[in-house]
């Protein structure tokens, strides 16, 4: 939801020295929680789902230029489990949704978005990956008060680029992100249309299935509450259940030294610096100038 952001954010002024260092590696004590156990009959459904995808690919081959990226995506050991969980075991729905995403990825090519293409969207820090929650989920901050561009396809590509980098940062055993949306400084003049917000919500829910672990919506004024009320019918129940609004203390879920000190319980005195942030993230994720990675995608 990067395009929810606007200029002129006034953040809490915390005393003491600040740091531009970005936390891109989970602390030793952060451990992924146990994965949901399979239910009776799920193994057979998973095999059928995988075969359905293979049969589809045999009839609709991937373009050669994108084939290696599709193979990496399909090789994720829990890919099929995520789709089955997202549909609560509905095999027919799982088949439809995974093929929808396969075709979307062939068209959008999220793994190979060049950094320079989306760098202008990153200059004000409206999306920041920094820190990990107690279960080693990467934390993605979305700050509407730092919007610096007009609504465009590039904004959506930057949202997807940020999600892909969050996935790259996940340690083994972790499949989800924690998202913190900070509406501090947001005003009505820069709010997106409901249609635009729905489009992004569709991408997140449809093509990044079961990637949201937790979400916190902070510093939310009343007019944003009305916006969420209008958007709510377009959010699936699973997504809505993971969102917490104006949480008074986030340290139940995120260690204070991993949480930006702009938020309840946070103690990490982070100061955004575009050059430092961009260089650190691109290098940590192994992103090359053409958008490809030096290491296999997580």
Give the location of each predicted region.
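Basic, amphipathic alpha-helical/coil surface patches used to engage anionic, phosphate-bearing ligands
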Residues: 1-298
